[in-house]
Each structure stands twice: as structure tokens, then as C-alpha cells.
Amino acid sequence: MRNQTKMMLVACLMAVSTPMAALAAAQDYAFEAIKAEVRNGPGGDIAVRLVHKPSGKPVEGAVIFRTRLDMSPENMEGMTTKVEPLTESEPGVYKFRADFTMAGGWALKLQAKVQGEPETVQGAVVFTAKD
């Protein structure tokens, strides 16, 4: 009977500890552009996919709490524009609307919380605004 109790205790400990070991780290996630080119001008829609890199699967339900869109790819980090979040259109795809005021490279910098991940997931995606 004692062996059976010990085995049950070990099984319970394994079941409780396995999810903790399975947690990914913030660097196991990446934001990717759905389409890297966008129309220069007002009301440009952009979309990014949040991916869990080890599995390659999209991550849905992330809470994106900070965004910044600037022209840092063109060495003009001070040139920014407002970013308006839109609704999640498909699992793991996050859409935004912005006014692209100049043709060239724009970096969308994001910070997000992913369920079960204690660290903040951060990333940047480069878009090219074309006339």
C-alpha cells in the first residue's frame, strides 16, 4: 500500500510540474508581417501574425498593450504616426490602421501578453509604404 501511495504522489507531482516545464519563454514568440507592403497615405491597414516559433502555430488571444509605428528603418525614429487597433480577424492575426505620411520603411513595435507566459512578448515588424 505504501508503494502505491508513493507512486500516486509522484504522478501528482509530475502532473503539476509538467505545465511549468512546458512554458515557453518570451523569445519563443515572433511577430510576422502578413503583407510587408502598404499603401502610402491615410488609413493604411497592416496586419501581423504572432507565432510560437517552436511549434510554428499562431498565437490567438494575445493582449497587445503597446504599439509604436515609426520610421526607424529610414533612420528617422522621431517620425511616428498613430496606430489604431482593429479586431482580430483570424487566429493569431492582429490588424491595425495607421496614416502613413511618407513613403519608405516603417517599423511597428509591439508589446504583448500571452496567456500562460509570465514575460512580456516584444517584437518589431517592418513595413514599406509605397506611393
Predicted features and spans:
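Contiguous segments within soluble domain cores/interaction surfaces
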Residues: 24-103, 107-131
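Bacterial N-terminal signal peptides
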Residues: 9-19
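Bacterial N-terminal signal peptides that target proteins for export
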Residues: 1-9
